[in-house]
Amino acid sequence: MNNKNWVLITGGAHRLGREIALAFAKAGWSVLCHYRTSKDSAQKTRQEVQDAGADCLLVDMDLAQDNAAELLMDQCVQLTGQPPQCIVNNASIFEADDAPSATAEGLQRHFQVNTVTPLLLANALYNRVRQGSGVAHGTHCVIHVLDQKVHNLNPDYFSYTVS
């Protein structure tokens, strides 16, 4: 499976992640579709990507784990023999709360999944590419998906918004 352009899409099983996976597939990329609990949706997305003529492999990972970024990168390299050429950090958790009801656990989980792991995943890609070639530049990229909460602040979904 080497010498293919692989894209890792976190949260690639449904909604926007699915659409991103299909767009990459139609553009000729092979897709690593990450999911946490949406295995059925991930399998459907894999079939749609394959129907579009692209390879698609599924990777299951809880991004709230402290070492999720390294584990996910390890999985990708084991499956394809190389780090992905592109990562689309699309996965997130989105749980309702407000400032008075926010808990340390909820804030930490949101921050881990929505901020820490995506940034560490970018670092893991950098380190893998650098290990392989001695340099860390060229044809690799990382895309971080944000939503309207960045510009539309309001008190609902407090932990999500601050993460």
Region spans (language model):
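Conserved NAD(P)H cofactor-binding loop of Rossmann-fold oxidoreductase domains
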Residues: 90-96
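Conserved glycine-rich Rossmann-like NAD(P)H-binding loop of the short-chain dehydrogenase/reductase
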Residues: 29-43
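Conserved glycine-rich cofactor-binding loop
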Residues: 6, 13-14
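A short, exposed helix-loop element centered on a Lys and neighboring polar residues
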Residues: 122-123
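Substrate-binding pocket helix/loop in short-chain dehydrogenase/reductase
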Residues: 98-111
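The beta1-alpha1 cofactor-binding region of Rossmann-like NAD(H)/NADP(H)-dependent oxidoreductases
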Residues: 39, 60-72, 104
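Catalytic loop of short-chain dehydrogenase/reductase
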Residues: 134-163
